[in-house]
Structures are given as structure tokens and as C-alpha cells.
């Protein structure tokens, strides 16, 4: 009898502890970061000088949606698969890209704030161009390659062309 009682008490605890939690349990939350007025002005001047039109997000990120996509919008805990090209707005130098095959996958919450704010603006299959100020990008610190060569100087403004291939 004691064994059955123990089993009846233990079973719900085991089931609850093994059940899938909600998305808030993923460990990531929405960042409240936003661009400064100086950063916003820089991007506005860049867009104007290059005859580009973009929409300003409430965070100070600017974007153009080339294709809105059709299904599944990314959330902070979503696994996203993308193809992308990242370049420096100052000189157009491409510092990173992944445009081959099925793309590369990340948890959105692991990425820079600019991507966290921008990718949910499109759906699965969509394409977006993001103009990201330093405060929503890599910040004040240099980013180096595997050889220690600086590929993204601190306080860089970044442009990413992104194809959101899949959202899970």
C-alpha cells in the first residue's frame, strides 16, 4: 500500500517536471536597448546620402522589408535559420556572410539586439535589410577574426541583408 501511495504522489511530480515549459523559460527576454539621437541621425544621413528609404523601429533600428514572408514570426526564443550578408555602413566592406545552402541557425535571443528587434518584423521566408546603430549592434568594442585582425571596428554602424529561411 505504501508503494502505491508513493507512486501516486510521485507520478504527477515526475510528469510536471518533465513537461515542456513555456517560452519564458528559455532564459532570454526582450531588450529595452535603444539608439541615441546621434546614432539615429547618422543612419538618417546615411540613408539620405544613398537615396534609400527605410522605416525607423521604435528602438532606433532602421529597416526595409523586401519580402514579408508568409508564416511563423520569430520570437526571442525561436530558433531561426538565415542566410545573410553583413557590411559596414561607413565603407560597404562585407565583414561576414552566409549565403550558401540551407543557411545557418541560431536562437534569436543569442544574437545582437538589432537582429532581435528586426527579425520579428518578417515571417518565415521573408527578406529584410537592417541598418543597425552601434548600441544595437556590437557596441564600442572591436570584433576580430580568428587571427586577431579587426574586422568590425568598435562603434560601427552595420547593414545586414537577411533572408529568414525558417523559424522554429
Residue ranges and their predicted role:
Residues 1-18:
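Sec-dependent bacterial lipoprotein signal peptides
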Residues 5, 18-168:
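Cross-family detector of peptidyl-prolyl cis-trans isomerase
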Amino acid at each position: 500500500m505504501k508503494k502505491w501511495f508513493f507512486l501516486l504522489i510521485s507520478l504527477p511530480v515526475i510528469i510536471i517536471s518533465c513537461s515542456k515549459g513555456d517560452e519564458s523559460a528559455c532564459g532570454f527576454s526582450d531588450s529595452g536597448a535603444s539608439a541615441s539621437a546621434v546614432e539615429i541621425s547618422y543612419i538618417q544621413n546615411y540613408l539620405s546620402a544613398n537615396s534609400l528609404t527605410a522605416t525607423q523601429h521604435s528602438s532606433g533600428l532602421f529597416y526595409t522589408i523586401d519580402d514579408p514572408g508568409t508564416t511563423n514570426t520569430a520570437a526571442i526564443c525561436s530558433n531561426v535559420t538565415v542566410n545573410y550578408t553583413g557590411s559596414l555602413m561607413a565603407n560597404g566592406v562585407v565583414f561576414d556572410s552566409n549565403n550558401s545552402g540551407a543557411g545557418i541557425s541560431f536562437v534569436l535571443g543569442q544574437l545582437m539586439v538589432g537582429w532581435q528587434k528586426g527579425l520579428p518584423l518578417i515571417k518565415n521566408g521573408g527578406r529584410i535589410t537592417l541598418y543597425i546603430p552601434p548600441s544595437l549592434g556590437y557596441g564600442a568594442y572591436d570584433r576580430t577574426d580568428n587571427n586577431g585582425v579587426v574586422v568590425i571596428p568598435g562603434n560601427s554602424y552595420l547593414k545586414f541583408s537577411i533572408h529568414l529561411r525558417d523559424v522554429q
